[in-house]
């Protein structure tokens, strides 16, 4: 079991992103960040734009600093202080930076240090589908919130430790198999991506039919209804939640963004190298 835990309340920004609050430094300087399972770096703006990190205002600053998430304090965390940003980076956005939760690449992610400092071994996401409710979502470091899922999670092993990546066996449109993934496809759950991305050949079919019933793994189906994969735009405009992307990583690659993670409570378990899905509640 995890020795500690922290619950982070998330704000839903029009179904396009989910962000919550962290603190950096001693005393903590507060920032709102997107918790992104598709990247590994923590970065916040330096004291030149937006909510800004001021290194001289922290007694623990060394080019690393303490990061406070809920009741957890992660010590000596590397992060990027962004001193310059493109003018439109934060256009109409309510968050300051990004906290990466994928595997170690060029820096040590926050959750690696949580693990190494004996704090937590897993974290889980619940993303609220109702933009009108005050509670936008919840990120739990160190456990699961039983109020936000039904039944048991279906766990799949991580196949490649760069993203939280796993294999999928089939993609169905309606109840019909496309057969596209018979030779093998890969996917990763990405809380920092708004849409669901996949190979052009299949996404074109989905967007033509706009009747996807989901993805299949280990003979367990995860369905998507029109309310879950169609986004609301201006007035009478509707936007497809599927977007084409022809990338490969051990096979054709799907990115299961917020469109997928809203209906499915998602667990990222580093202790056992598993990703788990259960119906969200």
Curated annotation (Swiss-Prot):
This is Cardosin-F. Residues 18-278 form the Peptidase A1 domain. Heterodimer of a light chain and a heavy chain. An intermediate form is produced first, and undergoes proteolytic processing to remove the internal plant-specific insert (PSI) and the propeptide. It comes from the Eukaryota. PANTHER family: ASPARTIC PROTEINASE A1, BETA-SITE APP-CLEAVING ENZYME, ISOFORM A-RELATED. InterPro entries: Aspartic_peptidase_A1, Aspartic_peptidase_AS, PEPTIDASE_A1, Peptidase_aspartic_dom_sf. Gene3D superfamilies: Acid Proteases. It is found in: Microsome membrane; Protein storage vacuole; Secreted, Cell wall; Secreted, Extracellular space, Extracellular matrix. GO terms for biological process: proteolysis. Keywords: Aspartyl protease, Cell wall, Disulfide bond, Endoplasmic reticulum, Extracellular matrix, Glycoprotein, Hydrolase, Membrane, Microsome, Protease, Secreted, Vacuole, Zymogen. Aspartic protease with a high preference for bonds between hydrophobic residues. Belongs to the peptidase A1 family. It is an enzyme of class 3 (hydrolase). Pistils. One of its GO terms (molecular function) is aspartic-type endopeptidase activity. Transmembrane segments: none annotated. Inhibited by pepstatin. The lineage of its organism: Eukaryota, Viridiplantae, Streptophyta, Embryophyta, Tracheophyta. Optimim pH is 4.3. Active from pH 3 to 6.5. Glycans are attached at residue 213. N-glycosylated. The active site is at residues 36, 190. Its EC number is 3.4.23.-.
